[in-house]
Amino acid sequence: MSVDEKPGSPMYVYESTVHCANILLGLNDQRKKDILCDVTLIVERKEFRAHRAVLAACSEYFWQALVGQTKDDLVVSLPEEVTARGFGPLLQFAYTAKLLLSRENIREVIRCAEFLRMHNLEDSCFSFLQTQLLNREDGLFVCRKDSACQRPQEDHGNSAGEEEEEEETMDSETARMACATDQMLPDPISFEATAIPVAEKEEALLPESEVPTDTKENSEKGALTQYPRYKKYQLACTKNVYSAPSHGTSGFASTFSEDSPGNSLKPGLPMGQIKSEPPSEETEEESITLCLSGDETDIKDRPGDVEMDRKQPSPAPTPSTPTGAACLDRSRSVSSPSCLRSLFGITKGVESTGLPSTSQQPLVRSSACPFNKGISQGDLKTDYTPLAGNYGQPHVGQKDVSNFAMGSPLRGPGPETLCKQEGELDRRSVIFSASACDQPNTPVHSYSAVSNLDKDLSEPVPKSLWVGAGQSLPSSQAYSHSGLMADHLPGRIRPNTSCPVPIKVCPRSPPLETRTRTSSSCSSYSYAEDGSGGSPCSLPLCEFSSSPCSQGARFLATEHQEPGLMGDGMYNQVRPQIKCEQSYGTNSSDESGSFSEADSESCPVQDRGQEVKLPFPVDQITDLPRNDFQMMIKMHKLTSEQLEFIHDIRRRSKNRIAAQRCRKRKLDCIQNLECEIRKLVCEKEKLLSERNHLKACMGELLDNFSCLSQEVCRDIQSPEQIQALHRYCPVLIPMDLPGASVNPPPVGVEQSLAPSPCAVGGSVPCCLEPGAAPPGLPWVPSNTSENCTSGRRLEGSDPGTFSERGPPLEARSQSVTVDFCQEMTEKCTTDEQPRKDYA
């Protein structure tokens, strides 16, 4: 965190699951090509090139030998205890985390690892692997007690009865650990500690030279004499082991083990031999063991015993009750501790607190089988219910007995699958190999792993199982809601569409076959491809059933569902809501999901054609041009069914494209019309503004004309001038002047009144004030004064009728035109110049 960053701000941490593996791959490639190697190791006259940092990180011996060396090209000669045949696999393990062992080199590898103090190996697997590789050859456990992780072995020269019991124990151990021979390292390893009494726990803390021979023999004989008691205790624990919760320290949960009556229940190793684990949250999260939640009732009891054993590494030989077999679960993470760092000897059972909608589900687990590593961080707090029993026998809770198909053997991933997992949380495959040593973790909210789902998923990609590709989901558990299985055809499944964690597809799994669902009317197609996000398979997939008993579509949802929705009740409520119309989503002609004419064909639910397998992706059918498409068709030998399907797909694609183009043309037309409408609206607003401006100008002109007319009328003194005025501007009529309109005015008067503004026209009258008229002559305004804004009418006088020389009366209507205004302006401008001369 930076200095200026607020501590309360949210922090986002990205943790890569492949970064460590990629670094190891890069370092190993550099070592093979002798790039950046800075140390040469000489072992039995054989040179090994390596990096100092890698050696110092893996071995305490190299840490002490290489730290402080400043030479550029350092040469280190290892002592005689280190052999080339034992050091080669260890060097390869340092760079690849994989150790290759055989019966010929296991002893030398063990000696070299002990000498070089590579505790990640000696603490985890040497005892187990040595037992597996040597017990078939020698018939007994051959392992010296010269390291902290080695277990005391039984003497080969015991009595015949004891030897039979020993062989029986070995046979059961070998049968239960059969899968571990296939996965040597660094796969998860599960084994059980041999039955050792407390006296041998003392010897485990002492060097081999300090342990007397008679003490070893007595302790080994004591172990054999105590075998029946341990056997009885095992049978008792098998019945009552699941009544108490199990706890782990430092975030490492104790694991389950399953013991048959022929196997002895062996206590864990002393806590003094177990390396302390740093109490960090990262280490707790990196470990892939199952952390069991629940009511921790006796957490104060057993950890107390552990602390007492740690304080007293060499206790007196007092009778101690073994706490149960401990199954080691090794984490593959680089910074994870060794197997023995998880808690030993405190496992008695698990108390599951099941959810309300689910019953207690069994967890069938073999002692020699490691747990699956695909556990997310949230799963570390999930409760589990163990179930003791054989691997091939199904065990189901009482509540769900009627909903499960019985008798399906469990199958787990083989060595190749385990090597590819690398503990990643995005495991997206539910295909398991035919190994009988491992199985996926079964949480309490999933159905039993012995249902028909595991039987179907054990086959390589069944035809009825479709898994949506290209989607990464937050968990790796396989959930089987196999109720009402009788309604389906054999090999068909109906998973719950509302399961909390849906099924995922593994990106490293083999590519799925190109699978397609088609009906007789060719109305619905779903084509599954590996990683084809743009293909129709990116939508939820529907499979129509041909069985008359099942009317709904089998739906495999690849969406992330709410964690709280689970159980049979939710499954039964959601299942009837699935409609067959959802299959049209893959053929929808546009992005909004509407139907086109080509996609609205009828599709009966009962009619379902066979699968159509194509030798090329479905995207090429729709994307390729016509010539390339024809060439591709000619290159492959296709059946009539395939050709019909291909042409139908291409036809639908062309129809969809044509419909999209048609909609695009319509949208373009609509946009063009909208643009035209906007232009017309703008032009209308512009014209209206011009009209208002012209009206304002015309009003100003009328005001000026009225004022000028009033001034002219005030200057009139004689009747001749009045007659001349009304001749050119008939505005006012004197009532008592009968001959005014007959006698023409003098020529001088005409010339003097010709440039008057009244000659512009009679459309705008000029109203004279009463005082301006000659005495005895009343003046009456004519009809032309109606449109004068500044004119005044004389009260009680009748209007006269005069002819007008101006524009017609229609021009003075409410809708004043532009032409009239221009005419008025031109006349006013033309007559104004002579008036200036006259003035």
Swiss-Prot record:
Biased amino acid composition, Basic and acidic residues: 297-312
Comp. bias intervals (Polar residues): 247-263, 583-597, 781-790
Chain location of the short sequence motif Nuclear export signal per the record: 819-839
Keywords noted in UniProt: Activator, Cytoplasm, Disulfide bond, DNA-binding, Isopeptide bond, Nucleus, Phosphoprotein, Repressor, Transcription, Transcription regulation, Ubl conjugation
Keyword Transmembrane: no
GO annotation, cellular component aspect: cytosol; nucleoplasm; nucleus; RNA polymerase II transcription regulator complex
Compositionally biased residues, Acidic residues: 161-170
Cross-link Glycyl lysine isopeptide (Lys-Gly) (interchain with G-Cter in SUMO2) mapped to chain: 381, 420
Tissue specificity note: Detected in brain and spleen.
Subcellular location: Cytoplasm; Nucleus
Protein name, per record: Transcription regulator protein BACH2
Taxonomic source organism: Mus musculus
Higher taxonomy: Eukaryota, Metazoa, Chordata, Craniata, Vertebrata
Underlying gene: Bach2
